[in-house]
């Protein structure tokens, strides 16, 4: 007996070992497949922001930068750091994708935590990685279905929506097109209606529907059916769907099941859609049914897809995933859902715009316009109420669906606490106020200037109660922030004084170029005025383009730059646009000297501004830190677009109205012809802002810009002192190579100096990216100032 038991134990051990080896082999093979897929099968990749999907009920909503990769099988996302060994954070199998559409995550009723950007959504069902994809393709039924949790009849099959925020309109369009194309090639089933907004826990932000299962309020874009053959004389619907009579015993509602021609409904439908039914619905009967992925399609060819579930009633009947009780009975309100298949995109003008060039269209503030073509990032073709058509700057308008507080003069968006205080103190008016985004993400703050008991600015967090009402004092609650502001215009209600006026009209932002597709400017269009300064490249004068737009005109010295190369680059640089970058309008290249025409910044260079206002700035750590953050935002944009500045310093940043700081002259150093400027031995080279790899090998990168940014921070917190004092360049080079860094400025907090030291890490790979610096400094600002 003992021997038998021992032998059995030995055999069992062998079986376990064999099983373990097979499992290990499968795991290894899966890793190899993943590696192969990433190396050879990547269709598109890039960095974007991902919104948490909150599959678990009580997990918090957050947004994180991720590296996304689209292959022919999956849409995956990874940690953004450690490029060579990124850790995968999640993936969506494209067999499970049901829709890819633009989304609205911010604005009225949206997520106040949402970062700026261009969101889109990917609606999908969860599909397992290996065997289930085979089942999907071959229609093998059984068990729990196709990797989606098999459910007993009457229970829900989980469906999810991934929200991703792209960096530009163009990038979003490219991602949507790419994902749809791969899904089309794979014959994945589609959803026909969807919600463009978010479910807030109480209602949809888009249509205000009060049920999470409310029918989708917008028609999804049409996807071509890759397996349709127009030559056979039948319609796509005939090829791709099998209708089920509303009078049959199978269903009480009208719907179609979209399916793959190689699969059969079999026991899936005949047996009440059991475990082998379509999408793996059910769990008991119908084991031999098809597992071909299907999407519910009402006979109006409209369906929706969101995080709401696909349902089965107690009889095994399929119900519409997004409608309580299934497809609506004719005559009910839901049955009259409007078909928005021809969706009209409306925008509202935030600023006035005067059309000067032919083909452009003037904008009237607060007027609505219909978008005809938004394929270009910075100039859209629109139609006004009178039917006039032309191009307008896209940053002057906001989609009506996204329009929130931007329509109000008192809303200043991302303005910091320090800039708000500076702005409100300028007018010195009692009751002057602004509403801004709080440093605490997702909240808003009211900043109010009062003279009681003396002139100062008070800040009040706008809070929400359990009923989602807004208040400054719990005794006075309102449904919306505008209602709250209106109330406190007439009643102080616990504030230091009544709200009376906002400071002034918002400054009109610059456009990407002076007109649609215009980058070459004729010198006769410019009226040159006073000299603003001079530098390495020549004299800078103030100018006016066609007598209406203030500009700065850089008159380049002949022989100082590679002109032909720069002119080509200028075509691209006019399309770079960010609130913290000085806008390049265009060039005058048809005569010599060349003119470079840029946005005019009334307070001039940051270096001179710091030195002029040292007495008022040196003790205002919050305002100095805000300047650093603004520069980091502009540099984050350049970093994302693979632009290297090469000469980042306080002298190459400019200051405009409302203490706005912008980065100037980005990329210009690349076109300098002076050899001394690009060698470590010359006096003109910005050695005191250069890292070791630039001093030793002239090796520029985004990380060399990070080093220079650390020096710029030091300049800001010393109010324009020269780095390394009177040390000669050779002495500076020696110190940098030995790892000796600049000392902490007296007015600088330790937390801020710690960020500077990170920028001065000896190896470029050890320095943080600008987007990381931006987040770190924002956190420091919140800790030190709010």
Curated annotation (Swiss-Prot):
Keywords: ATP-binding, Kinase, Metal-binding, Nucleotide-binding, Phosphoprotein, Proto-oncogene, SH2 domain, SH3 domain, Transferase, Tyrosine-protein kinase, Zinc, Zinc-finger
Gene Ontology terms for molecular function: ATP binding; non-membrane spanning protein tyrosine kinase activity; protein tyrosine kinase activity; zinc ion binding
SH3 domain: residues covered: 342-402
Catalytic activity, EC: 2.7.10.2
Gene Ontology biological-process annotations: actin cytoskeleton organization; cellularization; courtship behavior; determination of adult lifespan; DNA endoreduplication; dorsal closure; female germline ring canal formation; head involution
Domain SH2: residue ranges: 410-503
UniProt keyword annotation of Signal present: no
Pfam assignment, any one: SH2
Domain Protein kinase: 526-779
Cofactor: Zn(2+)
Residue numbers spanned by region Disordered: 1-23, 226-301
GO cellular component terms given for this protein: apical part of cell; cell periphery; cytoplasm; germline ring canal; plasma membrane
Catalytic activity from the UniProt record: L-tyrosyl-[protein] + ATP = O-phospho-L-tyrosyl-[protein] + ADP + H(+)
Comp. bias regions, Low complexity: 14-23, 226-240
Binding site for ATP: 532-540, 554
Enzyme class: transferase
Cofactor: how bound: Binds 1 zinc ion per subunit.
Active site location: 647 (proton acceptor)
Compositionally biased residues, Polar residues: 241-260, 291-301
Modified residues (Phosphotyrosine): 677
Summary of the knockout phenotype: Flies exhibit shortened copulatory duration (due to incomplete fusion of the left and right halves of the apodeme that holds the penis during copulation) and reduced adult-stage life span.
Protein role: Required for proper ring canal development. Also required for the development of male genitalia and for adult survival.
The name this protein goes by in its record: Tyrosine-protein kinase Btk
């Amino acid at each position: 007996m003992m021997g038998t038991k021992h032998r059995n134990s030995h055999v069992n051990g062998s079986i376990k070992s064999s099983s373990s080896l097979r499992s290990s082999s499968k795991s290894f093979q899966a890793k190899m497949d993943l590696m192969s897929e990433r190396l050879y099968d990547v269709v598109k990749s890039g960095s974007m922001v991902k919104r948490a999907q909150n599959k678990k009920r009580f997990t918090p909503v957050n947004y994180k930068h991720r590296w996304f990769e689209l292959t022919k099988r999956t849409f995956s996302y990874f940690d953004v750091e450690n490029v060579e060994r990124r850790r995968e954070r999640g993936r969506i199998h494209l067999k499970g994708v049901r829709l890819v559409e633009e989304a609205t995550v911010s604005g009225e009723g949206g997520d106040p935590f949402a970062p700026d950007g261009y969101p889109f959504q990917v609606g999908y069902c969860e599909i397992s990685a290996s065997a289930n994809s085979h089942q999907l393709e071959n229609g093998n039924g059984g068990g729990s279905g196709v990797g989606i949790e098999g459910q007993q009849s009457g229970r829900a099959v989980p469906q999810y929506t991934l929200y991703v925020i792209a960096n530009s309109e163009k990038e979003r369009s490219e991602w949507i097109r790419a994902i749809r194309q791969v899904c089309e090639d794979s014959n994945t089933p589609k959803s026909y209606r969807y919600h463009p907004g978010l479910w807030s826990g109480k209602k949809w932000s888009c249509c205000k529907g009060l049920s999470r299962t409310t029918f989708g309020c917008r028609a999804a874009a049409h996807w071509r059916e890759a397996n349709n053959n127009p030559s056979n004389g039948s319609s796509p619907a005939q090829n791709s769907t099998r209708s089920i009579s509303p009078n049959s015993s199978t269903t009480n509602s009208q719907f179609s099941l979209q399916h793959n021609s190689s699969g059969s409904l079999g026991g899936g439908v005949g047996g009440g859609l059991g475990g082998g039914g379509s999408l793996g619905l059910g769990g008991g009967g119908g084991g031999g049914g098809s597992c071909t992925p299907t999407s519910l399609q009402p006979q109006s060819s409209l369906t929706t897809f969101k995080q709401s579930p696909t349902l089965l009633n107690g009889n095994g009947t399929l119900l519409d995933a997004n409608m309580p009780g299934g497809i609506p009975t004719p005559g009910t309100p839901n049955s009259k859902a409007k078909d928005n298949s021809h969706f009209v995109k409306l925008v509202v003008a935030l600023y006035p715009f005067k059309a000067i060039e032919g083909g452009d269209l003037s904008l009237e503030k607060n007027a609505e316009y219909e978008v005809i073509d938004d394929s270009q990032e910075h100039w859209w073709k629109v139609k006004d109420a009178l039917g006039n058509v032309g191009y307008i700057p896209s940053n002057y308008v906001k989609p009506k669906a996204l329009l929130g507080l931007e329509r109000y003069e008192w809303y200043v968006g991302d303005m910091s606490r320090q800039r708000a205080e500076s702005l409100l103190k300028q007018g010195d008016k009692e009751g002057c106020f602004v509403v801004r985004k709080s440093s605490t993400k997702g909240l808003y703050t009211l900043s109010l200037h009062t003279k009681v008991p003396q002139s100062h600015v008070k800040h009040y967090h706008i809070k929400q109660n359990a009923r989602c009402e807004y208040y400054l004092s719990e005794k006075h609650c309102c449904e919306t922030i505008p209602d709250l502001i209106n109330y406190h215009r007439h009643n102080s209600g616990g504030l230091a004084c009544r709200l009376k006026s906002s400071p002034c009209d918002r400054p009109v932002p610059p456009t990407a170029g002076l007109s649609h597709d215009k980058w070459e400017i004729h010198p006769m269009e410019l009226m040159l005025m006073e000299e603003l300064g001079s530098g390495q490249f020549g004299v800078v004068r103030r100018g006016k383009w066609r007598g209406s737009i203030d500009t700065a005109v850089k008159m380049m010295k002949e022989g100082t730059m590679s002109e032909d190369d720069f002119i080509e680059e200028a075509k691209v640089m006019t399309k770079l646009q960010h609130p913290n970058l000085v806008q390049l309008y265009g060039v005058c290249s048809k005569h010599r000297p060349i003119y470079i025409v840029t946005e005019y910044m009334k307070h001039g260079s940051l270096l001179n501004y710091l030195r002029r206002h040292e007495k008022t700035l040196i003790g205002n750590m919050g305002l100095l830190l805000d300047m650093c953050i603004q520069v980091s935002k502009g540099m984050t944009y350049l970093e994302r677009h693979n632009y290297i500045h090469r000469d980042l310093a306080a002298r190459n940043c400019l200051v405009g109205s409302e203490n706005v700081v912008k980065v100037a002259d980005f990329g210009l150093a690349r076109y300098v012809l002076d050899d001394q400027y690009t060698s470590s031995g010359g006096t003109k080279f910005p050695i005191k802002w250069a890292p070791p790899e630039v001093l030793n090998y002239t090796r520029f990168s985004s990380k060399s810009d990070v080093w220079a940014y650390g020096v710029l921070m030091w300049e800001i917190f010393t109010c324009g002192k020269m780095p390394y004092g009177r040390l000669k360049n050779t002495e500076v080079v020696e110190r940098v190579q030995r790892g000796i860094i600049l000392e902490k400025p007296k007015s600088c907090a330790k937390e801020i100096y710690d960020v500077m030291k990170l920028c001065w890490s000896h190896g470029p790979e050890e320095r943080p990216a600008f987007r990381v610096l931006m987040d770190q400094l924002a956190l420091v600002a919140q800790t030190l100032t709010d």
